[in-house]
């Protein structure tokens, strides 16, 4: 398997032997436990479903509790799925993947849910330029301006950049470098920033474009 699920703990910096400061994101990756193995016969594709972390038994509904019990694993805080090859699909239920799967120098893609910033205008959301502050303009400083053309086409095209929800969406940052792997504390140090707020789940995969 080429990916793991972890929790973003925040950012810090480390120093090289030459005294160069490197900004890093700290990601805690507890053991990822296999809860289901999907195959071509029953599901039409090969994948491993995994969970990580823990969850109070009182907060797990009966279908989920039965699903975890069938795999004989402790209930985790969520379920994630990774497409795998036939060779990787030969593991057994309850098998664990550790942070030691990565090594310093690996290039990874990190996926998470970006911080929600609420309803935002076009200047903040799409980097539109503002209109004149004066010279006859008294009401239209931060408005987007015209959103259409004329009688033809007589509509606003789908995908038009307008005001709306900013953030709170799935984002992937590609080609980040693994700087350090701490197997004892189960943490990964990745150069640069990754999507999401502190404490939120992120998916770390080996880069597809490296």
UniProtKB/Swiss-Prot annotation:
Part of the 50S ribosomal subunit. Forms a cluster with proteins L14 and L19. It comes from the Bacteria. One of the primary rRNA binding proteins, it binds directly near the 3'-end of the 23S rRNA, where it nucleates assembly of the 50S subunit. This is Large ribosomal subunit protein uL3. The gene is rplC. Belongs to the universal ribosomal protein uL3 family. Disulfide bonds: none annotated. GO terms for biological process: translation. Methylated by PrmB. The modification N5-methylglutamine is found at residue 151. It comes from Hamiltonella defensa subsp. Acyrthosiphon pisum (strain 5AT).
